[in-house]
């Protein structure tokens, strides 16, 4: 009986041991790898960071068939304990402690932990293996990380390509493979108006619309073309908000760069005028008559145009005139003073022009830069040369075209004195003369970089003029002079009234 009693006690202990093992396994739940299944990725931003998001469990009632499986598993465990009573002998205290730990672990499991988009799960930490940061090139251990651009990053290593500060926002801008804060990208790449200095707004269709000068590249909002923003009458640049242009008092404004070399009165312009006459003489195209030259205001030039019966070929904005009729013209006698962004104490004088030949005088607007004033003089002197040499009744495209060629060639002689592309064309007329070389530039000591750039703009204006008489006429005249030379082209014009083809 004693043996039988011990056997029952041992059987009871072992049954309880087997049951506790099964209960521990049941309370432990499924394996971590099964609980943390594939997690969807959340995309943040534009072509952006990929965050790892765990699947949150839903509150559902356990299926009924789970209870049947539990009863079946309990029966198997009891049968197994009875079969192996002689092989198992476990201490009661250890079994109780193991059961307590299992219950405690089960109670500590919280299926509704706060969601952290940057925190990887334990399964991910084990499965991702060795990861290298795309920024510092060091291993990414446990903790927060970013997945973007096909690489992994420490949060502090994923930085803006402009300001170099970490990108912590959920949205950012990607240019190629370079990430930017959205504001940094806007500062770098969103066009700003060069006039109001603000970001150019979008139009009704959401597109960024702006105007840009074809030569200077100055960008500005379309509204500045209609809000009376001053525009330089010489270089065509619009006045920025942080700069003041000089008002010439006749509706024209002048930027500071153009004002630096502006010619303001008739006496100041005489040396330039005589240097251009010398340029013509060096081309074997000497003007035999002394033609007066006057600098005038805009109103005086317009009045002289109205009184001129000949020469209907004028640009929308006329800046020079070759007179053939006797008139009284008011010229600028003394250079005005500059004060408070306007001209002061301008002294003018009326002057009666008497006709002594086919040309009465040459008039040019005052206040223009030296190179622009010179190109206008070269153009108007060619009108005078044609009239003095007996060229009559020429079409507008022919006369204005060949005059523009002379203006173009003089400008080139000033800004490209030794490397002119048109050197051969401009000297071909003087091939029979001993003076076959291009005259030196009229400004001693050369010109500044700013003035040279301004001269290149005036060349660009002549070459790209869209008008029929001045634009098409110049291009046809240039092609003829470039192909046949200036002398042969002029002879052909005298005989046929047109350019050689």
From Swiss-Prot:
InterPro entries: DA1-like, DA1-like_dom, Znf_LIM. Gene3D superfamilies: Cysteine Rich Protein. CDD domains: LIM_DA1. GO terms for molecular function: metal ion binding; ubiquitin binding. Plants overexpressing HDR3 produces enlarged grains. Signal peptide: none annotated. Residues 33-67, 429-448 are annotated as: Disordered. The UIM domains bind molecules modified by monoubiquitin or ubiquitin chains and promote coupled monoubiquitination. It comes from Oryza sativa subsp. japonica. Keywords: LIM domain, Metal-binding, Repeat, Zinc. The gene is HDR3. Transmembrane segments: none annotated. Interacts (via N-terminus) with GW6A (via C-terminus). It comes from the Eukaryota. SUPFAM superfamilies: Glucocorticoid receptor-like (DNA-binding domain). The lineage of its organism: Eukaryota, Viridiplantae, Streptophyta, Embryophyta, Tracheophyta. Residues 65-84, 94-113 form the UIM domain. It holds the Pfam family LIM. Residues 53-67 have a biased composition (Basic and acidic residues). Ubiquitin receptor that functions as a positive regulator of grain size and weight. Functions in the same genetic pathway as GW6A to regulate grain size. Modulates grain size in a similar manner to GW6A, by altering cell proliferation in spikelet hulls. Interacts with and enhances the ubiquitination of GW6A. This stabilizes GW6A, delays protein degradation by the 26S proteasome and enhances GW6A histone acetyltransferase activity. This is LIM domain-containing protein HDR3. Residues 131-191 form the LIM zinc-binding domain. SMART domains: LIM (SM00132).
């Amino acid at each position: 009986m004693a043996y039988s009693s011990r056997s029952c006690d041992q059987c009871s202990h072992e049954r309880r041991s087997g049951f506790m093992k099964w209960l521990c396994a049941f309370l432990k739940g499924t394996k971590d790898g099964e609980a943390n299944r594939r997690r969807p990725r959340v995309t943040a931003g534009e072509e952006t960071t990929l965050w790892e998001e765990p699947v949150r469990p839903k509150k559902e009632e356990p299926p009924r068939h789970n209870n049947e499986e539990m009863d079946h598993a309990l029966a198997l465990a009891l049968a197994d304990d009875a079969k192996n009573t002689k092989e198992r002998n476990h201490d009661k205290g250890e079994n109780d402690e193991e059961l307590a730990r299992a219950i405690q672990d089960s109670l500590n499991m919280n299926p509704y932990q706060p969601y952290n988009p940057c925190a990887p799960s334990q399964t991910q930490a084990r499965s991702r293996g060795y990861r290298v940061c795309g920024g510092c090139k060091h291993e990414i251990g446990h903790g927060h990380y970013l997945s973007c651009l096909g690489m992994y990053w420490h949060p502090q290593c994923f930085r803006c390509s402009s300001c170099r500060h970490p990108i912590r926002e959920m949205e950012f801008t990607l240019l190629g493979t370079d990430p930017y804060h959205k504001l940094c990208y806007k500062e770098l790449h969103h066009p700003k108006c060069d006039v109001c200095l603000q970001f150019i707004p979008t139009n009704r269709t959401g597109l960024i619309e702006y105007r840009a000068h074809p030569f200077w590249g100055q960008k500005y909002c379309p509204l500045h073309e209609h809000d009376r923003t001053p525009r330089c009458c010489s270089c065509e640049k619009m006045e920025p908000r942080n700069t003041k242009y000089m008002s010439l008092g006749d509706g024209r404004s002048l930027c500071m760069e153009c004002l630096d070399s502006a010619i303001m009165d008739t006496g100041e312009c005489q040396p330039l005028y005589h240097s251009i006459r010398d340029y013509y003489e060096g081309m074997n195209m000497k003007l035999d008559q002394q033609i007066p030259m006057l600098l005038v205001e805009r109103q005086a030039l317009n009045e002289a145009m109205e009184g001129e019966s000949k020469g209907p070929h004028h640009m929308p904005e006329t800046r020079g005139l070759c007179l053939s009729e006797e008139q009284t013209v008011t010229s600028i006698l003394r250079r005005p003073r500059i004060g408070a962004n306007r001209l002061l104490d301008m002294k003018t004088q009326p002057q009666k022009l008497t006709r002594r030949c086919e040309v009465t005088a040459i008039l040019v607007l005052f206040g223009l830069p030296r190179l622009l004033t010179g190109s206008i003089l070269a153009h108007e002197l060619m009108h005078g040369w044609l009239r003095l040499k007996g060229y009559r009744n020429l079409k507008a495209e022919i006369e204005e075209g060949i005059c523009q060629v002379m203006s173009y060639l003089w400008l080139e002689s000033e800004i490209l004195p030794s490397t002119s592309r048109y050197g051969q064309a401009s000297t071909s007329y003087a091939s029979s003369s001993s003076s076959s070389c291009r005259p030196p530039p009229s400004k001693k000591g050369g010109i500044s970089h700013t003035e040279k750039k301004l001269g290149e703009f005036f060349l660009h204006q002549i070459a790209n003029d869209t008008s029929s008489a001045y634009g098409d006429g110049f291009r046809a005249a240039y092609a003829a002079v470039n192909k046949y030379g200036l002398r042969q082209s002029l002879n052909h014009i005298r005989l046929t009234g047109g350019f050689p083809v």
